């Protein structure tokens, strides 16, 4: 009888542990896992992270075919950027003033042989963000998709070598995804530029990817070659 009792008790404890490990909060996060990851977590990505629009036909995205790209044009640091583009270091930037969802914004950048803006340094982040439109948010190349971010806190830039995402100006600091708007339906990051001179009035936040915002494209020879 004692053997049966302890065996039943042990089985019950295993069942409780299994159920606890499967519990998720309303956002889809598993409590106690994401919070264990530090903001300095290594964040290595492949050279170009293509989010393949054919696989984005979900609540958050539209099924948008990838554009037909024109032959690559090398951008040399000594050359001027195309008319209307902004130069910083060896890259050119385009501030798109048509209101678009995230997927369409990225597609429009691709048509210009560019990606959504990826900051390689805080200096670049501040310089280019300063050209965005006052009182509006602009899409950038930063996402945190729920199906592959269960075990890490940081969102992903579209290209490698970018600044640690936790270092940019999130609305709530120190950075945590949930307090900065992230949910299963709000996966895409946008940068809001305040008309006020106070720096803390501008911020980065997660939004549903179907929201209509402006966007910032970035283009250089490395990006152009990677898109082909």
Curated annotation (Swiss-Prot):
Residues 88-218 form the C-type lectin domain. Disulfide bonds join 109-217, 188-209. InterPro entries: C-type_lectin-like, C-type_lectin-like/link_sf, C-type_Lectin_Receptor_IMM, CTDL_fold. One of its GO terms (molecular function) is pattern recognition receptor activity. GO terms for biological process: immune response. Residues 1-18 form the signal peptide. It holds the Pfam family Lectin_C. This is C-type lectin domain-containing protein 88. It comes from Caenorhabditis elegans.
């Amino acid at each position: 009888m004692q053997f049966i009792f302890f065996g039943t008790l042990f089985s019950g404890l295993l069942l409780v542990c299994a159920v606890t490990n499967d519990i998720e909060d309303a956002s889809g996060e598993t409590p106690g896992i994401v919070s264990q990851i530090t903001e300095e977590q290594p964040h290595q990505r492949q050279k170009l992270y293509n989010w393949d629009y054919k696989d984005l036909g979900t609540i958050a995205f539209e099924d948008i075919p990838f554009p037909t790209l024109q032959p690559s044009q090398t951008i040399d640091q000594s050359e001027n950027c195309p008319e209307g583009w902004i130069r910083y270091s060896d890259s050119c930037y385009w501030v798109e003033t048509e209101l678009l969802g995230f997927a369409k914004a990225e597609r429009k950048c691709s048509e210009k042989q560019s990606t959504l803006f990826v900051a390689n340094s805080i200096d670049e982040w501040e310089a280019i963000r300063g050209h965005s439109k006052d009182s509006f948010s602009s899409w950038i190349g930063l996402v945190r998709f729920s199906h592959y971010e269960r075990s890490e806190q940081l969102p992903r830039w579209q290209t490698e070598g970018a600044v640690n995402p936790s270092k940019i100006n999130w609305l709530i600091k120190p950075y945590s995804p949930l307090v900065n708007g992230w949910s299963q339906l709000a996966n895409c990051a946008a940068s809001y530029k305040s008309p006020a001179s106070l720096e803390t009035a501008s911020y980065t936040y997660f939004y549903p990817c179907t929201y209509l915002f402006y966007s910032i494209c970035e283009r250089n020879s490395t990006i152009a070659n990677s898109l082909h």
